[in-house]
Structure formats: structure tokens, C-alpha cells
């Protein structure tokens, strides 16, 4: 049998591995971080300025920010092919008491979107970025061919707004306002929970949606299962991004589906990935729910045809991955893996190890081990 793990992950600086190839370059990460800081600064001063200019006489609070999604989970992969982009989610929060000063929630949602977009315009024009305003739950700023920043807008309970920690890094259409005011009869703040985080939505006004529990859940899974679990999630995303140039199963779906399937395999990322991939099709077909909100189906979002498409893709992937680990030729194994992951998988058959069946079995732990510390210095 073959041990392909050195080509998936290594801690040796002078050897390449797919895990490192999935990272954005240091220059790209620095550019994104700098752009995010500039966007935050722009919104921090710009939203209060725009609102005051449009008649809000009361003291307008500065928004707070909370990074969510793959940048926060350390599962962000560089794009695999055009037109993919690295997606950085940076939530923008205002306190509920301020947002609910408007008579109707729909008005408040529209005002929040419009104020943020108006505030961002000078920065976007100066940097020659692109402002995308047709996403229902966020404002998107395309900052480079390889990356964009998504800014979802939230109303948060006042006491949580006060305690929300600041991150360590740092078309105003009146027609649509009129439309919003005239929308739904149920358009009253009393219909919305005052103790929940609400996400502004361009069509649905506000939705109960708090990104923080998902982040806490995933980081808790990594703490319990070790860094190998985080790497396996990144490999699943890498396969998806090579298989589907757009679409495919969402990252949160892959994370939630993989978590109960994962078993730590000592220094064998290839086998840890194979364990998950082998069980993934049945798990997808059986339905996967949000791990922090069981009433929310993640597979439903993908649709029945999308779920079946993904399940079949992972069935084929499992055959290839199992065939590669059982192959007699390291060169053939590398060719097969590059077919599944693209050129980011190293074509270095001389680093593939031939191992016995007994050694492969020994890589599986009898019991769950402690949190893995090796590799935490590397970007993940």
C-alpha cells in the first residue's frame, strides 16, 4: 500500500505539500487584511456620517465588526480556477435600539444597506474596486481578481453590542425606501425577537441569524479532534473547487457533514480524508442539518439534484483515493490525485512511501487522542 500523506501535509519547510499550496500567498493575505481594515475604517466613520446627513439627529453609534466564515475558521483556500475568489466575510453590527428607531423593520434594513453602500462608494472608487449590491444578505466588494469581501449587516441586542469584541485586525435609493415602507402588513418590530441577532435581508427585511455559534462550534471541533480535522475540511473544499468551477456543496455543509465522520489517523492525512469521503455520500443523501440550529437543513439549500450530484462526485472520488492508496505505482497515484485536486497536488512520486497493511491499520487510533499541536504554526 502507499502512504500519500507526505504530499498532503508536511511540517518540513523544504518540501512541498498540497496543504501549503491551498494557502493564499503572504502578499495576498496581507492585501486582503489591509483592504478589510480600510473597509472597516470607512464604515466606522461613514455610516454615522451618512445617517446624520439623511436626517438621523440622534447619536449614531459606530458599527462594530466580527470576522466570520473561512477566514475566521482558518479553512480559507486560495481559488482553484476562474471565476472563483477567496471569500472573506466581515459582519457589520449596529445595536438593536438604534436600528429599531425606524417605524418598520423593512425601512431599517433598507436604510442600513443604503447607508453602508453610500459610505463605501468613495473608498471603492478611489481603489478601483467593484461594489456589488445585488446579493440578498450582504454587500460585496471585489478587491482583486482573486478575492472579495462580503459585508453582512446585523442588528444585535444592545448589551451584546457593548461587549462585542473588536477584531484584532483591523445608491441611496429613495424609491426602494418608499417600496419598503409600503411592503408587508406584518412589518412591525414586535414581530421580531428582541433578544436575537438579526441579519438584514434585501427582500425579507430581517432574519434571525447569528454567525458566532457556528464559529464556536467549528473551533470546538478542531480543539477536540485536532488540527488534522481542519486540514481534512480544507482538502474537501479543494476537491470541490476543482470539481465545480462554481456551485457545489457549501463549505458549512462540508464541515457539518464531515465532523461526525472524521477519525484521527496518526500522520496519515490521506486515510483520514478517505474515512470521511467513504461515508460522505450516504450522509449527504440522508440530510445534514446546521450543527447549531437543528431545524435548519443544509442539504435542502443544495436541492435534491445538487445533493445527488455531490454524493456521486464523492463516490467517484472515494474510488480514486482508495485506488491511489492501494496502487502499486507512486507515479500513477500522483496522476490520479492531480486529476481530483488539480496541479496543487505535488507530482513528486519519490516522496510517496510504501507501507504494509499492518502499518496502515496501526495508523487508526483505538481511542480519540488529545488535541494535536503539530502544525499549528502553519497557516490552516
UniProtKB/Swiss-Prot annotation:
Effect of loss of the gene: Deletion of the capV-cdnA-cap2-cap3 operon (plus neighboring gene Q024_03603) results in about 10(4) higher titer of phage PaMx41 in this strain.
Activity modulation comment: Primed for activation by Cap2 which conjugates it to cellular proteins.
Induction: Part of a CBASS operon consisting of capV-cdnA-cap2-cap3.
Modified how: In bacteria expressing capV-cGAS-cap2-cap3, this protein is conjugated to about 130 cellular proteins by Cap2; more conjugated protein is found in the absence of Cap3.
Top-level EC class as recorded in UniProt: transferase
Gene Ontology MF term list: 3',3'-cyclic GMP-AMP synthase activity; ATP binding; GTP binding; metal ion binding
Secretion signal span: none
Record: residues binding ATP: 140, 209
Binding site for GTP: 68-73, 237, 251
Catalytic activity, EC: 2.7.7.-
Domain of life: Bacteria
Keywords on record: Antiviral defense, ATP-binding, GTP-binding, Isopeptide bond, Magnesium, Metal-binding, Nucleotide metabolism, Nucleotide-binding, Nucleotidyltransferase, Transferase
Catalytic reaction annotation: GTP + ATP = 3',3'-cGAMP + 2 diphosphate
Cross-link (Glycyl lysine isopeptide (Gly-Lys) (interchain with K-? in acceptor proteins)): 380
Record: residues binding Mg(2+): 87, 89, 150
Pfam families assigned: DncV-like_NTFase (PF21654), DncV_C (PF21713)
Gene Ontology process terms (BP): defense response to virus; nucleotide metabolic process
Family designation: Belongs to the CD-NTase family. A01 subfamily.
Purpose of the protein: Cyclic nucleotide synthase (second messenger synthase) of a CBASS antivirus system. CBASS (cyclic oligonucleotide-based antiphage signaling system) provides immunity against bacteriophages. The CD-NTase protein (CdnA, this protein) synthesizes cyclic nucleotides in response to infection; these serve as specific second messenger signals. The signals activate a diverse range of effectors, leading to bacterial cell death and thus abortive phage infection. A type II-A(GA) CBASS system. Catalyzes the synthesis of 3',3'-cyclic GMP-AMP (cGAMP), a second messenger in cell signal transduction, from GTP and ATP in response to phage infection. Its product controls the activity of cGAMP-activated phospholipase CapV, a phospholipase that is a direct cGAMP receptor encoded in the same operon.
Record NCBIfam families: cGAS
Assembly notes: Forms a Cap2-CdnA complex. A Cap2 dimer is bound on either side by a CdnA monomer.
Protein name: Cyclic GMP-AMP synthase
Naturally occurring in which organism (per UniProt): Pseudomonas aeruginosa (strain BWHPSA011 / Pa011)
Gene that this sequence comes from: cdnA
Amino acid at each position: 500500500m502507499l502512504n500519500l500523506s507526505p504530499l498532503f501535509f508536511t511540517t518540513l519547510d523544504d518540501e512541498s505539500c498540497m496543504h501549503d499550496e491551498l494557502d493564499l500567498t503572504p502578499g495576498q493575505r496581507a492585501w486582503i487584511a489591509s483592504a478589510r481594515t480600510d473597509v472597516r475604517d470607512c464604515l466606522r466613520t461613514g455610516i454615522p456620517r451618512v445617517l446624520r446627513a439623511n436626517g438621523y439627529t440622534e447619536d449614531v453609534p459606530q458599527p462594530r465588526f466580527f470576522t466570520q466564515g473561512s477566514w475566521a475558521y482558518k479553512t480559507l483556500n486560495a481559488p482553484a480556477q476562474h471565476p472563483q475568489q477567496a471569500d472573506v466575510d466581515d459582519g457589520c453590527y449596529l445595536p438593536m435600539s438604534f436600528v429599531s428607531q425606524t417605524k418598520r423593520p423593512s425601512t431599517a434594513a433598507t436604510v442600513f444597506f443604503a447607508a453602508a453602500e453610500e459610505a463605501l462608494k468613495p473608498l471603492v472608487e478611489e481603489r478601483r474596486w467593484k461594489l456589488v449590491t445585488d446579493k440578498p444578505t450582504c454587500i460585496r466588494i471585489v478587491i482583486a481578481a482573486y478575492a472579495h469581501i462580503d459585508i453582512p449587516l446585523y442588528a444585535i441586542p444592545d448589551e451584546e453590542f457593548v461587549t462585542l469584541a473588536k477584531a484584532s485586525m483591523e445608491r441611496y435609493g429613495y424609491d426602494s425606501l418608499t417600496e419598503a415602507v409600503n411592503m408587508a402588513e406584518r412589518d412591525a418590530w414586535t414581530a421580531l425577537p428582541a433578544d436575537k441577532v438579526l441579519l438584514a435581508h434585501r427582500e425579507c427585511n430581517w432574519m434571525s441569524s447569528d454567525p458566532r455559534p457556528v464559529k464556536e462550534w467549528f473551533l470546538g471541533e478542531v480543539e477536540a479532534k485536532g488540527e488534522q480535522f481542519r486540514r481534512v475540511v480544507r482538502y474537501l473544499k479543494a476537491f470541490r473547487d476543482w470539481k465545480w468551477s462554481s456551485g457545489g456543496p457549501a463549505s458549512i455543509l462540508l464541515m457539518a457533514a464531515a465532523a461526525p465522520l472524521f477519525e484521527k489517523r496518526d500522520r496519515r492525512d490521506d486515510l483520514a480524508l478517505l474515512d470521511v469521503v467513504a461515508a460522505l455520500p450516504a450522509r449527504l443523501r440522508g440530510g445534514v442539518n446546521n450543527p447549531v440550529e437543528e431545524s435548519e437543513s443544509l442539504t435542502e439549500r443544495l436541492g435534491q439534484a445538487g445533493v445527488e450530484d455531490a454524493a456521486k462526485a464523492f463516490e467517484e472520488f472515494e474510488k480514486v483515493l482508495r485506488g491511489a492508496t492501494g496502487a502499486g505505482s507512486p507515479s500513477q497515484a500522483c496522476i490520479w490525485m492531480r486529476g481530483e485536486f488539480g496541479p496543487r497536488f505535488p507530482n513528486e512520486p519519490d516522496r510517496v512511501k510504501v507501507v504494509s497493511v499492518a502499518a496502515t491499520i496501526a495508523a487508526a487510533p483505538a481511542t480519540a487522542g488529545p488535541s494535536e499541536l503539530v502544525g499549528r504554526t502553519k497557516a490552516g
